Curated annotation (Swiss-Prot):
Keyword Signal on entry: yes
Family as reported in the entry's similarity comment: Belongs to the SAA family.
Protein name per Swiss-Prot or TrEMBL: Serum amyloid A-2 protein
Lineage of origin: Eukaryota, Metazoa, Chordata, Craniata, Vertebrata
Keywords: Acute phase, Amyloid, Amyloidosis, HDL, Secreted, Signal
Amino acid sequence: MKLLTGLVFCSLVLSVSSRSFFSFLGEAFDGARDMWRAYSDMREANYIGSDKYFHARGNYDAAKRGPGGAWAAEVISNARENIQRLTGRGAEDSLADQAANKWGRSGRDPNHFRPAGLPEKY
């Protein structure tokens, strides 16, 4: 519901043309896929200390898609961190995750967070 409300707000208030609106939706969809791929890779790698790298990489890949991808990355990242905070995960770790998320969304190299020894596949 929040996604729909956000999209309606963007289209009405910002007077987005139908062409750019559908472009935004496509970017958001592709960005969400990038985030899912990073999450899946993180689970598959199961490598200690790599979570910040995968946070940054997912946000980086999504933001490269354009404004829709960056928006999707921010919404997904914030939702994930809020859910984890509610389930008792530490605030300090959540802040570090958010810093990695912002790093990636800003277009900076996610390899900054890459731990030594993480297989090249990732």
